[in-house]
Amino acid sequence: MRLLDVLLARRRIAPYVRRTPFVRSSWLSDLSGAEVWLKLESTQHSHSFKWRGAFNAVIARLERGTPKLARLVTASAGNHGRALAAAAETFGLPLTVFTPADAPQVKLTAIARHGAELRADSRDYDEAERRAKAFASETGASFISPYSDADVIAGAATAALEIFEDAADTDLLVVPIGGGGLISGAAAVAKAVSTRCAVVGVEVEVSCAFLTSVRAGKLVEIVPGASLADGLGGNPDPDTITFEPIQRLVDQLVTVSEQDLKDALVGLVTADHVIAEGAGAAAPAAVVGKRINVTGRRVAVFVSGANIDRARLAALLA
């Protein structure tokens, strides 16, 4: 991933995205002894950073005249599917989205609202991805991965570019990891524009495919467990393009517990008035749970999404 790819992505998607706020968290700063700032991708269209990559992927393919673009298909835990459904609707392309059966209803409703064909009956994300790829082979549809796609990664990385434009002195970037698309792009930007910024990736304890794989020196399959951060679960594609940049560019990988996630999600709401879903609270959870040493540093933390069902949020805040 070149910085030029990210700059081109930003120009390409500019009419369709919003520049999201980058705000200081007094709560996390006081708690950690650092200057902690939140990149609120939770306020992006569709309330997720996934909007950026989805629009870049579709527009870039239209620019290149990609064959088989008459129909799109994807797999998603919810947010990518919602964003890609909006992009497909914008450009008049039919889309089929495969999701786990237990994906949050707020995400499923939004996917259907944009006119995509929704197949929400997979056992888990891994099965949804296998079925989406089989559908692509059977129908000739163009499969757009939510993470292992250069255009998706470049689009997501535009959020990191905004961070360094707002705060060039950022010396620690904390990023959640699901399939690795966001952190691959964000780390590429960080290393291209800064000589001092370290990058930390955050997974959940019950689904830490990349930490396990980096330690093994190769991609290994894990058995993911259920988590509040449903958007971060599952195994990456064995051929994912995100593993190599994570190995090369990410300085540290950490995991957070379910309690860390709950504490971060509740704290964001009560102290910072920021709503986040479980996956969206994973990076703040690493600060809350003291999984990384941030004392005295200028820290940028992604709040990557806010698509949480009302009942679940109410239960956490009760």
Task: Give short role names for the model-derived ranges.
Residues 1-318:
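PLP-dependent amino-acid enzyme catalytic core
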